């Protein structure tokens, strides 16, 4: 579960994006849930608690910063990890593009807000919002990190 936090209920503000993804033994990434809502801190915290109960993620990544600290306090006891923006959003998306290019990303059709994520991907980087794209990239990168090494697609090819 990866979270790109925002706390504003204004229509023009970025929502808090949440993406749940899983990885199979063949290196396929499955996007299972997408959330993108303008909630208060407490409403977002409750939603994250529900996602934790539903999906039991090994880790819950929250983009670091002031809002990340607020959520970390609110969600103490959950398997939280801080996510750092180590490059601009376009570079981060490019870092996982090989999984799209090789057909290793699957979007579950009944996943919440999957069409909204698709629309953001098609409009990126010129769309009004990119929060779901960023959360998805974080989710994929969290799945592929083994210690400090980013695992490559080749590591999943079975002989």
What does each of the following model-derived ranges do?
Residues 1-83, 105-159:
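RNase H-like, metal-dependent nuclease domains and their acidic two-metal-ion catalytic environment used
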Residues 79-93:
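Conserved phosphate-binding/catalytic loops in two-lobed NTP-binding clefts
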Residues 92-103, 120-123:
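Short, surface-exposed amphipathic charged segments that create phosphate/polyanion-binding patches used
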